């Protein structure tokens, strides 16, 4: 019941995805060959959210791996859990998108997309009651951003009533891999605003900061970063997979976190994060977890929640704890920091409690927040976009694939609208309700 089909697109998506399956397989006691070697019935009770049981008791992930070049796929296949995936579910081209959004969305990607959709339909048909899709991709490259958003819009057409959740790695302010990142990211956001239900915003710089500051790693690798992301990803779906006192799922998350349809970009965090050396010096209590998860240093994207206000927030606790204590703590945070929560949504935090903690921890919490501070992220990308677009730099790579300059202008204005919408709700107070409703009508139109 309540299955989720997982899709990983492009190099970044496949690397995060591979790490995610390692984490999930560990939680469910499934070894790299797909056989169950755990010790608790709870691990198998709802293993079918992410796994399909094949013949001979083998568990196969409901995962689709796609890329426009074979390189990353080969390394996933050669990786520790590479033999877990169904061989037919590797869909790849040979050319590569060359960091070009237009190639991923219009030319190369469009040729490969039907093959991906066929595999997707097979997976969806194998589901009892499909809850939705989760996609891991980056917005800076060509495949994850261009082809990823193409796939999202195709899935939207075919499964309009299913939840579409993406884990999107945004270009980071100081760490840039490619020159045309701002173009690719802006064009992608333009699509995500319209077609995705929830977008979890991640960026490498924030992850590096967490690794340096909190985990005290001297030379963090992408593996470490991806591990952070997958810990939080596993937390988002834990109540679907394990019994709990207070459940949440992707749809409940969406309903509780999205006050206006366009504002569905969430920042998220995970606690407890401690360096390996200092683990034994910390007591894990609900107050301590709550304290850390609301900490700005804990967010997986470079926007400071203290610069904006939370429209809504959601905390997914895992482990043995009293729900009373959880509720008290959440209320406590809201009362003490009331200026950081908008006043026109009275009880704007949701919490859920799941009994089974992640491996190696007694308690943990995943935090998802819808904060107006995320506009910093969009502003930053938008400024870089404008700087290049004003000079029409690198534009011929996109127009050469059949794109029109108009599309860039549209994407840019959509991004700027998004920023001003966040700003508008950040400044809104409970009193101006009357004039506000008229404005709201305009936004929708």
UniProtKB/Swiss-Prot annotation:
Extent of Acidic residues compositional bias: 429-445
Membrane-spanning segments: none
GO BP of this protein: microtubule-based process
UniProt KW Kinase keyword: no
Subcellular location: Cytoplasm, Cytoskeleton
GO cellular component, one term: microtubule
GO MF term list: GTP binding; GTPase activity; metal ion binding; structural constituent of cytoskeleton
Entry keyword annotation includes Cytoplasm: yes
Assembly with partners or alone: Dimer of alpha and beta chains. A typical microtubule is a hollow water-filled tube with an outer diameter of 25 nm and an inner diameter of 15 nM. Alpha-beta heterodimers associate head-to-tail to form protofilaments running lengthwise along the microtubule wall with the beta-tubulin subunit facing the microtubule plus end conferring a structural polarity. Microtubules usually have 13 protofilaments but different protofilament numbers can be found in some organisms and specialized cells. Interacts with DCX/apicortin; the interaction stabilizes microtubule assembly.
Name of the featured protein: Tubulin beta chain
Taxonomic source organism: Plasmodium falciparum
């Amino acid at each position: 019941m309540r299955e989720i089909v997982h899709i990983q697109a492009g190099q970044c998506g496949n690397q995060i995805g591979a790490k995610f399956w390692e984490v999930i397989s560990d939680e469910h006691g499934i070894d790299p060959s797909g056989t169950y070697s755990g010790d608790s019935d709870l691990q198998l009770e709802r293993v079918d959210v992410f796994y399909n049981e094949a013949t001979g008791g083998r568990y196969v992930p409901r995962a689709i791996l796609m890329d426009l070049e074979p390189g990353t796929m080969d390394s996933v296949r050669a990786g520790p859990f590479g033999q877990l995936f169904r061989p037919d579910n590797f869909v790849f081209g040979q050319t590569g998108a060359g960091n070009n959004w237009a190639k991923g969305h219009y030319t190369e990607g469009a040729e490969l997309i039907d093959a991906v959709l066929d595999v997707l339909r097979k997976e969806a048909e194998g589901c009892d009651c499909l809850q939705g899709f989760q996609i891991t991709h980056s917005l800076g490259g060509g495949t994850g951003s261009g082809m990823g958003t193409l796939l999202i819009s195709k899935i939207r057409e075919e499964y309009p009533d299913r939840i579409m959740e993406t884990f999107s790695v945004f270009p980071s302010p100081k760490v840039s891999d490619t020159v045309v990142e701002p173009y690719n990211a802006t064009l992608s956001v333009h699509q995500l605003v319209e077609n995705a239900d929830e977008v979890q915003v991640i960026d490498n710089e924030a992850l590096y900061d967490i690794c340096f500051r909190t985990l005290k790693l001297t030379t963090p690798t992408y593996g470490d970063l991806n591990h952070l992301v997958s810990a939080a990803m596993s937390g988002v779906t834990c109540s679907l997979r394990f019994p709990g006192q207070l459940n949440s799922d992707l749809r409940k998350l969406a309903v509780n976190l999205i006050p206006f349809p366009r504002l569905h970009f969430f920042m998220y965090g995970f606690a407890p994060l401690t360096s390996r050396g200092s683990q034994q010096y910390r007591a894990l209590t609900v107050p301590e977890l709550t304290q850390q998860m609301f900490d700005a240093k804990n967010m997986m994207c470079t926007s400071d929640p203290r610069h904006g206000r939370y429209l809504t927030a959601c905390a997914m606790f895992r482990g043995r704890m009293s729900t009373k204590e959880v509720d008290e703590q959440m209320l406590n945070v809201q009362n003490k920091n009331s200026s950081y929560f908008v006043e026109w949504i009275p009880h704007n935090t949701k919490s859920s409690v799941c009994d089974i903690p992640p491996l190696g921890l007694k308690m943990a919490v995943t935090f998802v927040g819808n904060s107006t501070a995320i506009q910093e992220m969009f502003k930053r990308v938008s400024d870089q976009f404008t700087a290049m677009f004003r000079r029409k730099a690198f534009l011929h790579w996109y127009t050469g694939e059949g794109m029109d300059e108009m599309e860039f202008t549209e994407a840019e204005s959509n991004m700027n609208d998004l920023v001003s919408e966040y700003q508008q709700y950040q400044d809104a107070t409970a009193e101006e309700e009357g004039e506000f409703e008229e404005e709201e009508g305009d936004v929708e139109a």
